[in-house]
Each structure stands twice: as structure tokens, then as C-alpha cells.
């Protein structure tokens, strides 16, 4: 029996990187899948790659109204939802003097407010024993240079996974978190790092990881798959760190 056979699933930020790979693994395990994205090109590519059975929707994680619309679309498509992987996010690393209020608010809107209000909007849609997986980051634990706002958003999401686990347990909703270390994904490419400097930065980052390399979306998706499946039914409010040992070097 496939691990997610017949499960109705939602993956936000599912058109590239960890989200796209998770969608592929969910499909391989028998799930029905909805993914969201914001970039039209990425949406089109994901639709072509995942096939016609997958519903690919545009949804801006920064918009509370969009989260309500997404929850309604999920209800219309499935009736109820068994699994939600809330993966949509942005990663901006800057020194404190370069931050503006607009940039600060955008980071918290996408990374914190969006998933919070999506969970709220999905409450009437969740099936009994639903599983929610939040994508956080080892940045929630590590005081890395220039990561102040990004790390704060991920620490908020990690705490949300614990506090909402307690609050929603009586409703039969399990919430857990996966915290990746440095992973080779398009999100990393969007940091605005000059190409000439990127190779050196990659080597410097890899040197902080005991296993000596970046992780892959496939490796993170396997942890998400476990938390989404009934195999993790006794796991509530927990965090799976997938970081190649990065936290050993705090």
C-alpha cells in the first residue's frame, strides 16, 4: 500500500525546489495533489512537469484574502483536506542598515502571516486526523550574519508549529515542522548574490556543514513525506531537522 494512497494534499510554494519535489513524492505515494505558486512561468512549468491530474493554482502567501480563496478552492476541489505542506516563503539576507519597513513587512507577510491565516481558513476543511507540515529552517536556531529578519520569521513559524499543535489537537489536526539546512533550490538563487561571488560563498557555506555539501530537495521532501503520512501519527509539535549536521557547528 502506498504511504499516501488517496490522501488529498495541498503544497504551497509547490512549483519549484522543495515544494515541487515533495509534490512528485506525494504523487508517487498515491496522493492527490494541489500545488500553489506565484510566478506564471513556474506555474506553467510545474503543470507540465506534474501532469494534468495535479491542480496548480496561483496564490500569494502575503495576502490573507488569497489564503481564504485558496481554502475555498481546496474545499471545492476535494471537499476535505488530509495533508497540508505550507512551504511558500521568501529568503532575504541583508545587513540591518539596508532593511526598509516595506521589505520587513513583506518577509513577515509571506513567511508568517500567510501560513497562519491559511491554517485558520482551512480549519473547516481539514479532515479528521489531518496532518500539517510547516517548512521552517535551521536559521531559526543559528545566528547567521545578515539573516536577522529571515531567521526571525522562521523562528516564528517553528513556534507556531508547537503552539498550534496544542491548540488544534482537540480538533484532530497534527502540526509538525521540517527545518532544512542549506539546500540547493531556486530560493537560494533568488538571494541576489553575484555569480562571481557565488562559488566562493557556496564553498564557505558547505564548509560549515559536517557532511560537506548542500542538501537536496529530495532529501527534505522525504522528511515531509514521513510527517504527512500516518507513519508519524504519534508525532505532534515536533521538528525534523534535515541539515547535514549544520546545527552541530552552532
PLM regions and their residue ranges:
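Substrate-binding pocket helix/loop in short-chain dehydrogenase/reductase
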Residues: 95-96, 100-108, 205
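Active-site helix of classical SDR
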Residues: 119, 153, 161
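Short C-terminal tail/terminal secondary-structure segment
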Residues: 142, 225, 232, 236-250
